[in-house]
Amino acid sequence: MPQSSRYSDEHVEQLLSEMVNVLEKHHAPTDLALMVLGNMVTNLINTSIAPAQRQVMARSFAEALQASIKKADKAH
């Protein structure tokens, strides 16, 4: 989602692969996977971001998600 990152592509891809493997291991359908990932994002924001910044972070995350979907739609 982000255009630039302090994390290597390899590190991001490794984490993504491991998370996909967990979802596949549990045969999670798309709606369950999205529910779990959404709950994970909510938990990360609520436990790792200062209360005053949570709404801004959530909005920024949502905008980045929407932008990445639009970008993927244009590619297809």
From Swiss-Prot:
Pfam families in the cross-refs: DUF1414
Name assigned to this protein: UPF0352 protein PC1_1633
InterPro entries, sorted: UPF0352, YejL_sf
Family indicated by similarity: Belongs to the UPF0352 family.
